[in-house]
Amino acid sequence: GPYNLAVTPDGKLLVSSLKGGGGVQVFDLASGRSVFTMKSSTTGTHGVAISPDSRYAFLSSEGVGSDPGKVDVYDLVALKRVGSVDVGQQAGGIAFWKMEPRSR
């Protein structure tokens, strides 16, 4: 079921990691309905972070056995997984920090 939750900065979507089987579920906050559900690339889905422009969700997954943990990247406009990156085995939480270009 739902494990960690994050609301997109624009306030339109709620993204949930699904523990126990691994996956992601996205809800439209205006209607309260699920608009997308997908299995993650591993079973230990954990943390959720959203890009500042509300376009992408990043979900961390713990590694199982000797498999590495992963961060899956989901496009919240196209509603599909667009990438996956191997990370350390204990990839529990995740945070997104927006960096602004320096003024000259």
Name each region found by the language model.
Residues G1-R104:
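Predominantly soluble domains enriched in secretory-pathway, periplasmic, or organellar proteins
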